């Protein structure tokens, strides 16, 4: 594999950052100088290009990986063990100052059905400087939650009936504009680019629901919500987005619970957990059973943020919010593979 020099990566990051700034300036010019349909059309194009640049920028520091994905109970965990262990020995995971057998002490036991609910990354890098919290957990962000819940609704609903009307989308946007349009306080927890990422997901993956997608477009929901979303407090996001999953009460409840959990960590994208989070007989955060306990279980687990703040989070909700959990394997693995 050809390695790209850090200097080249830094140059690309600098260029994308400059381009992002230019798109912001273009967006401001459009807002101040164009009107009506011409303004909306130009704004869509600029905002869409800007959010693509932002996605590229955010991905530049990610390491290349090889990934395993497949059907349930076909031996993925054992394949990982065979790929990463040394001379057929058990695959050891470094958790603080101790090592643990991945298959026997961490990996969820198979019971004839899917057992793992969290993506696991293995690395030789030391991912935490705190031996008491050696596990790095990358969290889903607010936009990810919205997309996942929308996907759940559109993918798991056999027949969608009485979906939110164009008029309802328009009235919702109008009421939110009246309430938040003049607000000066803004946050970066959910921004305009995120709204256009959601819009793009609808276009790419819900294309079979052409009428619904077109009706949302006609209501100008995406553009109007994008203009004010950074002013809306997180405890009212469900008012903004529940219409997308047709006001399904269960999905809205899940959304509110998970957003509240993200709020506890100030919407950081990473937390660090102690070893009990993954060990069998303790937290077992990797086990898909945690997701089934989402609404009922009150068990908590200790995590530390990037600012070294120690918090207790709901275990099941942390599992649901985990985009990726990173475990450290022995450095000598790289020398033998």
Which role does the model predict for each range below?
Residues 1-72, 86-336:
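N-terminal low-complexity/disordered regulatory or targeting extensions
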Residues 74-76:
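Conserved glycine(s) of the Walker
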